[in-house]
Amino acid sequence: MGRAKRVVLAYSGGVDTSVCIPYLKQEWGVEEVITLAADLGQGDELGPIQEKALRCGAIESLVVNAQEEFVKEYAFPSIQANALYENRYPLSTALARPLIAKLLVEAAEKYGADAVSHGCTGKGNDQVRFDVGIMALNPSLKVLAPAREWGMSREETIAYGEKFGIESPVKKSSPFSIDRNLLGRSIEAGPLEDPMTEPPEEIYLMTKAIADTPNEPEYVDIGFNQGIPVSLNGENLAPVTLISQLNDLVGKHGVGRLDMIENRVVGIKSREIYEAPALLVLIDAHRDLESLTLTGDVTQYKRGIEDTYGQLIYKGLWYSPLKEAIDAFILKTQEQVTGSVRVKLFKGNAKVVGRQSVNSIYSPDLATYGAEDQFDHKAAEGFIYVWGLPSKVWAEKTRGK
């Protein structure tokens, strides 16, 4: 008896997930494989994916357009949280995984599957994100991860697939592993595994090389409503359209590249190249608007929560109780975060140069050093005495010892 009768497989069209189809059937005795591809803005690569899955042995191939859900339910909360992993990575790839896990569970329940499957290896982050997400959404579903168990090298995997007519898109001249969605691209493997090797320019698609960027700066006004981006240069835009247009605008100026060594969930370090032009600029602009509309103590407390939020996303805990509790806090903080932020784009740099809000708690009359100054300077002496009293008492008791 096989490990499962009917399986829903997360399918990308790449060699690993394509090989999973015959492997599940031939090696693990699965009777029926249904593939599911989530359209998260990958572009043309989804075109032939259904035909390829059926050719590899799937009984049905599903493509779910989840771009709007991806932006509204996953990207926007992350922007409200200013979520960055290790203070740099805006989680453009990681954010897609809990949504794909949700779609897998929904498809399994709809089609009566007794298991779901993915093509993640045993040393990556995605296996954790998928498995934990699926467990949280439907604990009764089995999760099959053939690539984690089959023990084949990359070359052996390609050779196995060739027996079933599966061609590999990975060539010696382009040995990179690439993941793409509307929020960005991640590139790894090949020569990038040497941390001293400069990434070749041809791996970048969303961002221009500095030499090819415009010679004049460009400004963009980003409008927010309760922490959610809603407009560009005064024009209200649908969520997917806003991200897409901002990607093009920001990437044109060479903004949005990351080259970093990160700590994976499984305990190893990896070298990752990311392109996430819109997401990086939106987080920067949103954080700046918060500085105008939130009190200092809320801002400072939220910064610590933001780091935890990024960790939860990266480590596959999107559906955890802690994440849900933090969401409630963040939503409360965003009630006043409405306004616009002006960003200057030029030669690989995105710089906030202006911000405004009807909820601004910045008072020019209190901040100015000019004649309009309304700050009560005399009150400072009493404040300083009370503020410094613990230090004064401590010094009196300890300095003489």
From Swiss-Prot:
Family that this chain belongs to: Belongs to the argininosuccinate synthase family. Type 1 subfamily.
Gene3D superfamilies per the UniProt record, alphabetical: Argininosuccinate synthetase, chain A, domain 2 (3.90.1260.10), HUPs (3.40.50.620), Single helix bin (1.20.5.470)
Record's GO cellular component terms: cytoplasm
UniProt cross-references to Pfam families, sorted A to Z: Arginosuc_syn_C, Arginosuc_synth
Complexes and interactors: Homotetramer.
Protein name (database record): Argininosuccinate synthase
Residues annotated for L-aspartate binding in this entry: T121, N125, D126
Subcellular location: Cytoplasm
Residues that, per the record, bind L-citrulline: Y89, N125, R129, S177, S186, E262, Y274
Pathway assigned to this chain's UniProt record: Amino-acid biosynthesis; L-arginine biosynthesis; L-arginine from L-ornithine and carbamoyl phosphate: step 2/3
Residues that bind ATP: A10, Y11, S12, G13, G14, V15, D16, T17, S18, A38, G119
Gene name per UniProt: argG
GO biological process: argininosuccinate metabolic process; L-arginine biosynthetic process; urea cycle
UniProt-listed Enzyme Commission number(s): 6.3.4.5
Keywords, ordered alphabetically: Amino-acid biosynthesis, Arginine biosynthesis, ATP-binding, Cytoplasm, Ligase, Nucleotide-binding
Reaction equation(s) it catalyzes: L-citrulline + L-aspartate + ATP = 2-(N(omega)-L-arginino)succinate + AMP + diphosphate + H(+)
PROSITE patterns: ARGININOSUCCIN_SYN_1, ARGININOSUCCIN_SYN_2
Primary location class: cytoplasm
Domain of life: Bacteria
NCBIfam families: argG, PRK00509.1
UniProt GO molecular function: argininosuccinate synthase activity; ATP binding
Cross-referenced HAMAP family: Arg_succ_synth_type1
